[in-house]
A protein has these predicted regions:
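N-terminal pre-Walker A segment at the start of P-loop NTPase domains
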Residues: 1-8
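A short, compositionally biased
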Residues: 8-10, 47-48, 105
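Short beta-strand scaffold segments in enzyme catalytic cores
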Residues: 12-14, 52
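Glycine-rich phosphate-binding P-loop
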Residues: 14-39
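Conserved nucleotide-sensing/catalytic segment adjacent to the nucleotide-binding pocket
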Residues: 40-98
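Conserved NTP phosphate-binding and transfer environment spanning the P-loop NTPase/kinase superfamily
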Residues: 87-153
Length: 153
């Protein structure tokens, strides 16, 4: 049986210095809000609400579906058109959770999508420090559990 090489998911994606960050969570978790704060701090929008993921070798590449390119929801303001990147290689998956679900000192976690393992963090999307935490996580590297490796078959 052949494994899929592409999927579309409900998420948001931004890139810091070209490194893609996939923001996941239920509606209202703060995906678009956090993306706007990251863009305001210098990140680039890749996709909001729906993200196309494509496996390219041992990497996952994120992009926006054509009708949504450059669009982001600013709750209370409306749909905004912003500059965007056509695509970004994913380096980090972030699950946005309730504040009481965020561990103070989490161990390494990974998420496998389309057979590619990526480091995963759980953050509260509305914390003021969330953009800084993500920038620092990329800069200093987030570990993938040793058993996961970069590519999961």
């Amino acid at each position: 049986m052949t494994q899929a090489t592409s999927i579309q998911i409900h998420a948001t994606c931004v890139a810091i210095d070209g490194a893609g960050i996939l923001l996941r969570g239920p509606s209202g978790a703060g995906k678009s809000d956090l993306a706007l704060r990251l863009v305001d701090a210098g990140a680039a929008l890749v996709a909001d609400d729906r993200v196309d993921l494509l496996r390219r070798g041992a990497c996952l590449v994120a992009s926006a579906p054509a009708p949504l390119r450059g669009l982001v929801e600013a709750r209370g303001v409306g749909i905004l058109r912003l500059p965007f990147l056509d695509a970004a290689e994913l380096h980090l998956v972030v699950d946005l959770v309730a504040r009481d679900e965020v561990e103070r000192l989490p161990g390494p976690e990974a998420e496998a999508m389309l057979g590619v393992a990526l480091p995963r963090l759980r953050l509260h999307g509305f914390d003021a420090s969330a953009p800084a935490k993500l920038a620092l996580a990329l800069r200093h590297g987030v570990a993938i559990p040793a058993a996961s490796g970069r590519s999961a078959a």
